[in-house]
């Protein structure tokens, strides 16, 4: 293989050529950063109701999300290297078609984890301790689909772990609102990753891979809808907590109505159980992440300067 061929294989291994996954991790991480900064400002009292995170914190967590998502993809392909070749959507992955070896995938995972760890040098030491949870969850998640029908829960925990880390970095420790935000993220992630699994359900059944799509069976869309509803309710409560004391009041909460409409459209598509329709519904969640980030960011900026 030429250098360019090998480089392309590594890019595909880490999914840098497919930014959808990056966004699904990046935006919720930044939700956590923004809310943690709001909480820190409100804890100071003296009538302060809002605040923004420092640019350095923002950049560190954004880079960390990008690198750890890439690391997660590398270890996922390592875990699935013997089954990806039997799934039409994944048979072209670099480990499945032999362009990269298992050792090269592990090496890529370790390099990306070390690069992510280097960012911790600029954060309080407590964040370093919390980061072990992220690494452990990212490593074990890909293997869970062999033993449980709930690998999506492990994925959600692995990707969502950046939220308590953001609170530790900014506030010193996670609080109840941090964990509610984490729970909301878990609900949303299990919902959209079930949509993703619905696209592969027939192949997964044939090769013995487990997923929530298989577990939920004909109740899949109903349970996805319930999880999305929980996300909206919990996220609404979190927004109420942070923005009710400000000049905006509960106005940002009403902004979640558009998310509800997005979810309704997704579920209408998934009701057909068509693999392509389910995959497109999954992809549509990047707009949920983007929109909620913009909603929170605008509210935080407005309240920081207008009270």
UniProtKB/Swiss-Prot annotation:
Its main location: membrane. It comes from the Bacteria. It holds the Pfam family UbiA. Its cofactor is Mg(2+). It is a multi-pass membrane protein. One of its GO terms (molecular function) is 4-hydroxybenzoate polyprenyltransferase activity. Belongs to the UbiA prenyltransferase family. This is 4-hydroxybenzoate octaprenyltransferase. It comes from Psychrobacter cryohalolentis (strain ATCC BAA-1226 / DSM 17306 / VKM B-2378 / K5). The lineage of its organism: Bacteria, Pseudomonadati, Pseudomonadota, Gammaproteobacteria, Moraxellales.
């Amino acid at each position: 293989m030429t250098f360019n061929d090998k480089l392309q294989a590594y890019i595909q291994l880490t999914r840098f050529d497919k930014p959808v996954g990056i966004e699904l991790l990046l935006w919720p991480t930044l939700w956590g950063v923004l809310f943690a900064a709001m909480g820190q400002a409100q804890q100071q009292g003296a009538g302060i109701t809002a605040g923004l995170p420092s640019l350095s914190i923002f950049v560190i967590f954004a880079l960390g999300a990008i690198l750890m998502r890439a690391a997660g993809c590398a270890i996922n392909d390592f875990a699935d290297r013997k089954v990806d070749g039997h799934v039409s959507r994944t048979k072209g992955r670099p480990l499945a078609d032999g362009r990269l070896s298992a050792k090269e995938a592990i090496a890529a995972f370790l390099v990306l984890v070390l690069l992510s760890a280097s960012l911790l040098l600029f954060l309080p030491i407590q964040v370093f301790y919390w980061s072990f949870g992220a690494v452990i969850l990212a490593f074990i998640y890909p293997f869970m689909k062999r033993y449980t029908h709930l690998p999506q829960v492990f994925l959600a925990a692995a990707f969502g772990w950046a939220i308590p880390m953001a609170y530790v970095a900014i506030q010193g420790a996670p609080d109840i609102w941090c964990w509610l935000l984490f729970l909301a993220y878990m609900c949303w992630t299990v919902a959209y990753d079930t949509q993703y699994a619905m696209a592969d359900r027939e192949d997964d059944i044939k090769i013995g891979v487990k997923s929530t799509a298989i577990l939920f069976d004909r109740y899949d869309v109903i349970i996805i809808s319930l999880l999305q509803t929980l996300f909206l309710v919990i996220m609404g409560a979190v927004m109420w907590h942070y923005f009710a004391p400000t000049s905006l009041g509960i106005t940002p909460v009403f902004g979640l109505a558009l998310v509800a409409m997005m979810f309704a459209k997704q579920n209408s598509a998934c009701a057909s159980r068509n693999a392509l329709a389910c995959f497109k519904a999954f992809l549509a969640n990047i707009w949920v992440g983007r929109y909620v980030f913009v909603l929170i960011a605008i509210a935080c900026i407005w309240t920081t300067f207008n009270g």
